[in-house]
């Protein structure tokens, strides 16, 4: 059965609580919340996920480059205390000003460490359709599965045809969470194209209507395949974006 997650940004704790309450009120089909670990905010992802328990299954993002190999995993105890049993591990980008200490740890190494030290935790990895060739990304996915990942959260897609291509490449048996987001300003269009090298179809329009139509089509795509989906509302009211779709 298809599960649905919302990716929420922990800008403030009060704001996050309000968003979680809105999701509970308007979207009873949403059973999961995933939260990125953004170093510009004071609340770490696993701390933010605690606010969603026990009403939601919560999945904190963990940046591999933040994990000090010589110290205990800082999220292990908070996760256990709040019954958080899933993580999404990405390598992470180094801070531009280098004021924050990072380590020479990649996603594969971090996945192996979680599998070794927290074997009860389900580990997801990232799938990025824009960073390298199809064959290179497929091989990278297989290495992360070998390291101990159970499945993948994808970067947001903007084209169902590209989703179909990757659906055929993902190793059989891996759990998949397809990613969608809303891009409704020229700034967002340029950000995704330049920073993440996203590919837009010719039919793309930076309107809420176009993004809502894609969200509905992608949800149907995931349900047809028995896979999962998450939505990443960016500076948009989640009810306006997904109301009537979920």
Indicate residue ranges for each PLM-predicted region.
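Glycine-rich, positively charged N-terminal anion/phosphate-binding segment
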Residues: 17-23, 39-54
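Extreme N-terminal starter segment of soluble prokaryotic enzymes
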Residues: 1-5
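Glycine-rich, proline-tolerant flexible connector loops at the mouths of alpha/beta enzymes
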Residues: 27-48, 89-102, 149-163, 231-236
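Active-site pocket-lining/capping segments in soluble small-molecule metabolic enzymes
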Residues: 6-18, 27, 88-95, 100-130, ...
């Amino acid at each position: 059965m298809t599960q649905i997650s919302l990716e929420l940004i922990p800008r403030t704790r009060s704001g996050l609580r309000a968003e979680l309450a809105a999701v509970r009120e308007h979207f009873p089909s949403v059973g999961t919340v995933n939260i990125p670990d953004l170093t510009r905010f004071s609340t770490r992802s696993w701390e933010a996920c605690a606010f969603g328990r026990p009403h939601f299954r919560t999945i904190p993002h963990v940046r591999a480059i933040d994990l000090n190999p010589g110290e205990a995993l800082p999220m292990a105890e908070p996760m256990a205390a709040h019954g958080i049993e899933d993580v999404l591990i990405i390598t992470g980008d180094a801070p531009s000003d280098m004021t924050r200490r990072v380590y020479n740890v990649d996603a594969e190494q971090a996945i192996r460490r979680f599998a070794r030290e927290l074997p009860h935790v389900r580990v997801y990895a990232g799938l990025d359709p824009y960073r390298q060739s199809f064959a290179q990304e497929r091989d990278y996915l297989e290495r992360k599965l070998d390291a101990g990942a159970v499945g993948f959260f994808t970067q947001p897609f903007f084209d169902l045809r590209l989703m179909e291509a990757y659906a055929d490449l993902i190793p059989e048996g891996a759990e998949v969470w397809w990613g969608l987001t809303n891009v409704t300003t020229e700034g967002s269009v340029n950000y995704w194209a330049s920073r993440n090298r996203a590919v837009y179809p010719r039919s793309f329009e930076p309107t809420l209507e176009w993004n809502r139509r894609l969200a509905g089509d992608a949800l149907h795509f995931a349900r047809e395949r028995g896979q999962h989906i998450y939505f990443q509302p960016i500076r948009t009211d989640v009810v306006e974006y997904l109301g009537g779709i979920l």
